[in-house]
Amino acid sequence: MTTAYYSTVLNHPLETVWTLIRDFNNYPAYIDGVTESVIEDDKSGDEIGAVRRFCYLGNWVRQRLAGHSDEGHSLTYAGIEPLPFPSGASPDAPAPTRYQGTMHLLPVVEGDRTFIEWTVTLDTAPQDAERWRTLFQSWIPDWTHSLERTLGLRT
């Protein structure tokens, strides 16, 4: 098991950020490379248990909404299938099937900004843990910067 963690301060009010990310199906609106997303079985994007299927960089990914709190400004998702990337992965180093990510927001009172922390924990073979942690440790900042750019376009 391994965990990747990233945090930063976004120069946007908490409610503005939460309004954008609270819908589990809204990934294409703020993550570069996500071209479409669909919630299966007609569930809503804030319903725990909802499954989203989204296309990221040409790869289809399925995740289940495992936790959602409007009061706590957080959402947690869990992988359902092995991650389909990176495409050059060796069959000896399979992609993790079990992983869980959490996006959590807190208000920064000074300047009306938002603290965001994004954690992804992956259940991997011990010999693959560092490789997966390093990958996610580089991807999460990219995703967060994509969110920041999207928010900048909306103001």
Feature map (PLM): residue ranges:
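Glycine-rich portal/gate segments that line the openings of hydrophobic small-molecule binding cavities
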Residues: 29, 38-94, 142, 150-154
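A short, structured loop/turn motif at beta-sheet edges
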Residues: 14-15, 66-73, 104-115
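Beta-strand elements of well-folded, non-transmembrane domains
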Residues: 12, 83, 105-107, 122-124
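Hydrophobic pocket/interface hotspot
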Residues: 17-21, 27, 52, 65, ...
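Hydrophobic/aromatic beta-strand elements that line small-molecule binding cavities or substrate pockets
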Residues: 6-8, 62-67, 98-108, 120
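Hydrophobic ligand-binding cavity/cleft-lining segments
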Residues: 1-42
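A conserved amphipathic terminal alpha-helix motif
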Residues: 92, 115, 119-155
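A generic beta-sheet turn/junction motif
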Residues: 10, 56-58, 109-111
